C-alpha cells in the first residue's frame, strides 16, 4: 500500500470544500474493510447500508453509504 487512494480522496475532499460543497457521499461495497477504513480515516461516517443491492461475479453485495460533512472534517485538524 503506497497511499495513492488516500492522496486521491483527500485531494477530492479539499477540492470539494474549496468549491463550496457542504458534504460528499460515497457508496462502497459494505464488506470491503479497507475501503471503509480509508473513508473513515478521511472523515466519512457510515450513514446506512442497502442490503443485496448489487451483483458482482454472481453474488449479491451490500452497499454502504458513507457521508463526509466537510466542515466537520476541517474541525478535526
Predicted regions located by residue number:
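Flexible, glycine-/basic-rich loop-and-beta segments that form/coincide
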Residues: 76-77
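Conserved acetyl-CoA-binding loop-helix of GNAT-fold acetyltransferases
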Residues: 1-18, 23, 36-41
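A short, internal acetyl-CoA/4′-phosphopantetheine-binding micro-motif in the GNAT/acyltransferase core
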Residues: 1, 28-29
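Conserved catalytic-core motifs of GNAT/GCN5-like acyltransferases
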Residues: 25-28, 36, 40, 45-62, ...
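Acetyl-CoA-dependent GNAT
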Residues: 9, 69-73
Amino acid at each position: 500500500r503506497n497511499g495513492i487512494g488516500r492522496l486521491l480522496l483527500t485531494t477530492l475532499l479539499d477540492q470539494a470544500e474549496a468549491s463550496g460543497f457542504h458534504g460528499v457521499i460515497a457508496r462502497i461495497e459494505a464488506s470491503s474493510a479497507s475501503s471503509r477504513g480509508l473513508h473513515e480515516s478521511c472523515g466519512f461516517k457510515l450513514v446506512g447500508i442497502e442490503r443485496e443491492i448489487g451483483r458482482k461475479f454472481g453474488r449479491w453485495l451490500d452497499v454502504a453509504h458513507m457521508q463526509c460533512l466537510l466542515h466537520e472534517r476541517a474541525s478535526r485538524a
